[in-house]
Amino acid sequence: MSFTGIFHFFTNSPCDAAEPWQLGSQDAATPMMQGIIDLHHDIFFFLILILVFVSRILVRALWHFHSKKNPIPQRIVHGTTIEILRTIFPSIIPMFIAIPSFALLYSMDEVVVDPAMTIKAIGHQWYRTYEYSDYNSSDEQSLTFDSYTIPEDDPELGQSRLLEVDNRVVVPAKTHLRIIVTSADVPHSWAVPSSGVKCDAVPGRLNQISISVQREGVYYGQCSEICGTNHAFTPIVVEAVSRKDYGSRVSNQLIPQTGEA
């Protein structure tokens, strides 16, 4: 964890963007990401146990059975107890790791039957197009806009370098969302670490993910599929606002377009 991450830890301030020298995960913004963090901690617990156990056996063997203390090594042809233990325990530990891992994996693949909102994310070289297809179903209106990265020499005060865009994806917090991901040219990827999602954008194919952002904030992500020269300069910015403010934020920032984009 970086010094900035330690500062966030003690001040209880969320970490929703990549930081220099960051080693840990970003703070969870969705139940999916919280599940990933919990699984990481659970697996790390078993790794520590294995490390301590193996290290103790190794140190004990080096200390008690080196050549000076034991010039004539003892030959053990058969050990039933040891063979049983070394077979059972390596079989049980992967079970404790696999069961929660598969449970999380299947939950990540679940799709909400009736999402409150659907957003389509289309990858381009090197920007993204977002479509709020059900922005106003009664008027058959949709919102479509392009999202470009802000150049390195043109950020405003407080904006993250090469992580900010001109048009953010504004979503309501604590709402079930369906995001449809595709590409218009080459393979891309739509990934936001704080949300625990990474979905490939494949030309001619529609992939979908379901998320529910649990707290308001601004969440940063990047393309995670090498897509050409400017692959590193296609960030993703998702801004979660309250349901009360969502309508006014979208209406003020974006221009509705009638019909499909």
From Swiss-Prot:
EC code: 7.1.1.9
Residues that bind Mg(2+): 225
Cysteine pairings via disulfide bonds: none
InterPro entries on file: CcO_II, CcO_II-like_C, CcO_II_C, Cupredoxin, Cyt_c_oxidase_su2, Cyt_c_oxidase_su2_TM_dom, Cyt_c_oxidase_su2_TM_sf
Regions annotated as coiled coil: none
Residue spans crossing the bilayer: 35-55, 88-108
Record text on subunit structure and interactions: Component of the cytochrome c oxidase (complex IV, CIV), a multisubunit enzyme composed of a catalytic core of 3 subunits and several supernumerary subunits. The complex exists as a monomer or a dimer and forms supercomplexes (SCs) in the inner mitochondrial membrane with ubiquinol-cytochrome c oxidoreductase (cytochrome b-c1 complex, complex III, CIII).
Identification of the protein by name: Cytochrome c oxidase subunit 2
Annotated source species: Daucus carota
